[in-house]
């Protein structure tokens, strides 16, 4: 009898343990199905350039029959708002075609280039990593059709002339002063000529114009709301400076990178106050006469 009791107790304990094990397994399985793996910390870093073909800052590039430019990154990337973010300096009649390939982008130039000219492809924040969309700010690809790269720099600030607030994302146009010989031409410069160099202000209104020549420029700022590289009176804000400015003759300025806002900051050398005008043309006094009754006898 004692032996039978011991066996019964053992069987009961075994059954209890089995039931408890099944309950715990079901509970853990339910919990596991409700939780998802964290996958580690969120990726907050932009793509890193690992190769450019041809090399950045290359010279003596052909005027026609351009080879494709390939820019490779350390991860897969995406293009966002490239029509709005991307621009060239100077402007090209046919905008380059940008496509994705592997872990990089391909840029196909489609325009005949000018001789002995430095070109800059400015991508803004169009290039982003494929997973989190982290932008690679202010990436530039620079080359020259001549033996040298123009290397002069000017900094400036664009502000609303009425509110004194900064004007972000406005384009800065640089025209060689020797192409504008008189006041009348100066007034119509942005209608008659194409800028020799282009820069764009950051969100804080600061701009840094790079790869300029060591010559005197006339400087204009245009908001360009339609992203067509054309000034449209009554729609776009515009600003201009009366004098001419040679980057070689300007004082040095400090420049640093704001890691929080993620753009370059500089002490401005030029200040452009922008306004909206239906007819951007100054009135010029062409003749001065006194009425006959007020003339001296």
Feature-to-residue mapping (PLM):
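Acidic carboxylate motifs that coordinate Ca2+ or other divalent cations, activating on Asp/Glu
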Residues: 228
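Acidic, low-complexity Ser/Thr/Gly/Pro-rich repeat segments typical of extracellular/periplasmic
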Residues: 30-211, 216-220, 234, 238, ...
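Bacterial Sec-dependent N-terminal signal peptides
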Residues: 1-46
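Long, low-complexity intrinsically disordered regulatory regions
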Residues: 253-261, 267
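Extracellular interaction modules
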Residues: 250
């Amino acid at each position: 009898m004692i032996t039978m009791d011991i066996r019964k107790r053992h069987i009961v304990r075994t059954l209890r343990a089995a039931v408890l094990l099944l309950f715990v397994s079901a509970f853990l399985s339910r919990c596991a199905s409700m939780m998802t793996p964290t996958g580690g910390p969120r990726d907050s870093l932009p793509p890193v350039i690992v190769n450019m073909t041809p090399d950045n800052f290359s010279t003596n590039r052909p005027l026609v029959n351009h080879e494709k430019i390939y820019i490779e990154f350390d991860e897969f990337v995406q293009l966002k708002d490239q029509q709005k973010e991307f621009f060239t300096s100077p402007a090209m009649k046919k905008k380059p075609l940008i496509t994705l390939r592997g872990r990089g982008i391909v840029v196909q130039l489609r325009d005949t280039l000018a001789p002995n000219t430095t070109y800059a492809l400015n991508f803004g924040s169009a290039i982003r990593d494929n997973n989190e969309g982290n932008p690679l700010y202010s990436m530039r690809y620079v080359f020259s059709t001549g033996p040298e790269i123009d290397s002069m720099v000017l900094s400036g600030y664009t502000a609303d002339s009425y509110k004194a607030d900064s004007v972000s994302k406005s384009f800065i146009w640089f025209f060689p002063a020797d192409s504008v010989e008189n006041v009348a031409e100066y007034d119509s410069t942005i209608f008659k000529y194409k800028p020799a160099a282009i820069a764009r202000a950051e969100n804080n209104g600061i701009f840094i114009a790079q790869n300029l020549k060591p010559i005197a420029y006339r400087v204009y700022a245009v908001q360009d709301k339609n992203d067509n590289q054309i000034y449209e009176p009554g729609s776009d804000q515009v600003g201009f400076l009366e004098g001419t400015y040679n980057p070689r003759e300007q004082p040095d300025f400090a420049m640093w990178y704001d890691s929080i806002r993620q753009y370059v900051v500089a002490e401005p050398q030029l200040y452009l106050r922008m306004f909206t005008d239906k007819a951007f043309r100054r009135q010029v006094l062409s003749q001065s006469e006194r009425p006959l009754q007020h003339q001296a006898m």
